[in-house]
Amino acid sequence: MSDCIFCKIANKEAKSNIVFEDEMIIAFRDIDPKAPEHILIIPKKHIESLMNLQSNDRELASHILLDVIPKLANDLKIKDTGFRVVVNTGEDGGQTVSHLHFHLLGGRSMTWPPG
């Protein structure tokens, strides 16, 4: 998607503070952090939202949840104190960029409800 900012970040056409990258995903610091550690994890391939994941995306989803998030939580030293993972989906869900992304937040106590 030529106008998708996250596609531009994934393709290194836009600047970001990358903390981790592999063949499937890129993870970078949020430009408007809501916690001391606020990382966005995005697939390199354009997927509009969680609702657009297909059965052939199982490996990608599993990789993010089982490999990438635990690795980042460990690297950021938030795995023992706790963290939150958020996926905003659709307008009412608070999704502001139409590219699937996972928020990893930590480094402070999280409250409920989130707002």
Where are the predicted features?
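HIT superfamily nucleotide-processing domains
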Residues: M1-G115
